[in-house]
Amino acid sequence: FAGSEGLSIRDLRFILKLMVWLNTTSTGDREEIRLTNADQRLWERVCGRSGDDCYNRESDCFFRQARVKASESEILVVNHALLLANSQASGSLLPEYKYLVIDEAHHLESEATRQFGARVSRWEIFANLDRYLDTQGPFARIAVLVLSQAGSLLRDTLSPAVVTSSRDALDLVRGGLTAWFKSLSDLIQEPLSQKKSRGSDSVRIDDRVRDLPAWGLFMQQLDDLYVNASTALVQIRDLNDKLESAVDAGTIVSTPWISDLGICIQEVHDLFVFLSELVSHPRKDVVYWVTLDAAGEGVTVLESAPLEVSGLLQEKLYQDLESVVMTGATLTIQGEFDAMRDRLGFADAEEVVEQSPFNYKKNVLLVTPSDMPPIDSPKYEQALGDVEIG
């Protein structure tokens, strides 16, 4: 990434921030560095998701270091997000374990709903596609690589023209997605205008939306786009296979740009699997909705979430464990665990309620200051700081 040409000022600022942070961090933890929304999009280009996507295997990799350290530990302490991400990744992120204690278990349902659902950002889709299609992107770099390194015998099957054809096929998909998002934004204007609550710019994709007269044409538009995407994926897979064969044969050298093709294939495939489900094959146990940009730029986010996560937690998290213990201060309603049992898929568990040793009447003081500025006042933070310091 840092070696790419044509980096913007924003890219360079992010790289400088990253370099300063890398000199101080020992863990590589995302929570240690403060990122803006724009930075977060760039972070996705450099972060590790499995430890297997590090281009330089001999370099320090925080992910692999953490995994080695975890494998040598007898007790692991992780947050709900990592615990569930591990279950989604078939246990590849954490060492194998048989005993699990979940503290603050009343938060598990909301995190499971988020992780077992899906979220697709329009900005992220086009940022990724533009990165692949850029004049300094992987297709352009690979075309130069093939021209300079591939022998004459190989150029009949692996030529710059083959690379360019794959890039053009992906560019056609990008253009189709632009038109598709515009159609979706136009389509949901009617249900958006009928919403009783105007405080939200989100619209659920339900039967009311699917029964709109324009929905059939909208589905056909996605079907046509899917054909173009399938064609592009076939070409890019073929190109990727030829490049990997050439690398194995020693005809060309391996570069991160070739690895990028594999990532591109997976991203485009996953995107169209989600779009197909949302538009053409919705599941009855899943809720789908879209969010519009407040500045009037149309639909910016597509999301889905399971209606309930108890079965998914049982299948993905609990079933292979010998013991699961859940603790929390608010697991009961009127002293009963029934509601939480149902929501967390914990029907057969033993239970115990321990009274809190904390003496609220003696140890808690509720103070309402009368001389504070309103919470939306520019002076509020300074006044709050003065009170805390005092």
Regions found by a protein language model. Name each.
Residues 1-74, 132-134, 141-156, 160-168:
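A substrate-engagement module of RecA-like helicase motors
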Residues 2, 106, 110-202:
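Conserved phosphoryl-transfer catalytic core
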Residues 40-76, 80, 84-91, 229-372, ...:
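A contiguous, basic/glycine-rich beta-loop/short-helix subdomain that forms a polymer-engagement track
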Residues 72, 100, 131, 165, ...:
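Charged, amphipathic alpha-helical oligomerization/scaffolding segments
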Residues 73, 80-81, 104-108, 112:
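Conserved Walker B
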Residues 89-95, 113-126, 311-319:
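Short, conserved "post-DEAD/DEAH" coupling segment immediately C-terminal to helicase motif II
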Residues 101-102, 108, 323-327:
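Short hydrophobic beta-strand that contains or immediately precedes a catalytic carboxylate
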Residues 162, 193-217, 230, 234-251:
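Long, low-complexity or tandemly repetitive, helically biased scaffold regions used
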